[in-house]
Curated annotation (Swiss-Prot):
SUPFAM superfamilies listed in its UniProt record: Dom34/Pelota N-terminal domain-like, L30e-like, Translational machinery components
EC number: 3.1.-.-
Name of this protein: Protein pelota homolog
Keyword annotations: Cytoplasm, Endonuclease, Hydrolase, Metal-binding, Nuclease
Assembly and interaction partners: Monomer.
GO molecular function: endonuclease activity; metal ion binding
Amino acid sequence: MKIIKEIPEKNIIKVMPENLDDLWHLSNIILKNNAVSAMTERRTEDKGDKLRADRGTKRRVYLGVKAEKIKFDENTNRLRVSGPIIHGPEDVPIGSYHTIDIEPLKDVSIQKNWKKWDLQRLKDAENSAKKPKIIVVIMDDSDATVFIIRDYGVKEIGHIKSRLSKKLDYKRQDQENINYYNEILEVMSPYEGKILVAGPGFTKNNFQKYLSEKHKDMLQRVVFESTNHTGRLGLAEVLKSGIVDRIYGEARLSKETQLVNKLLEEISKKGLAVYGVDDVKNALNYSAIETLLITDEFLRKNRRILEDLINSVEAIGGSSIIISTEYDVGKQLKALGGIGGLLRFPIE
């Protein structure tokens, strides 16, 4: 995310999202009734020909809408903000409905009552863009799954199946192993920076040996770790363990995973945790909240209630973390009511 311009007296910040993560951050910053302005395509009627209602010309115009619907669409790589037009060219009717498609590398101006956590989120997104992509390969002797870890969740970018069979002779087995490793490399190679390869058993060690013999330049970029599981279970194990943070520095999704798992652990032993709005409010009365966890969905639907809670937590020196429901731990927190708190000390 690039913060291009700030106009504090008008509560306007102009930004340029650079990737999908930035669009997701903006989907949590832009709220209903916020003013969103950008260059956009708008179909205007051809006044010279009234015979055909479907005629008109699409042209690029700069206009603003009062946000009514905000939809993050990972598949089309855009954030759609719909609402009545509040300003634009003279020939565009004020109050008519329009959808602005916010896409990477296109400027957008947002006018709203900026909260402290909104500004922090912009700053986090700005810093995140400077970090390399986090690539994790979970593999064993039958298949390998390659994931890219984003701020808002995980995307599978490759799944490779081994064609190794015990029915093959040793020479054919060696060749199938090489084919398997090369297919994994083909998915890994385009990404810069460190790559984490993890999994149970010895296959990852054999892959490491293959890299040391044939691809020493790639070996320097790869870190190998052990897990008990493959696939998404193996990935969850990696995120929970903190390995990703040790390799890449603090990663948002890894931090979220560890915090929600800590919350679940404390709940299971009736320890330093509460969940649900009423219990969180009660813990705040004792100034006991150390870390407040809220899902992005719950925040969007209950902004006014949660603003007071977040401010109260910050007033006692605590912190608030917004958890993405695009990934498993966010869904777990959602099942608890969308809100929970880690405590400084136990309360009755």
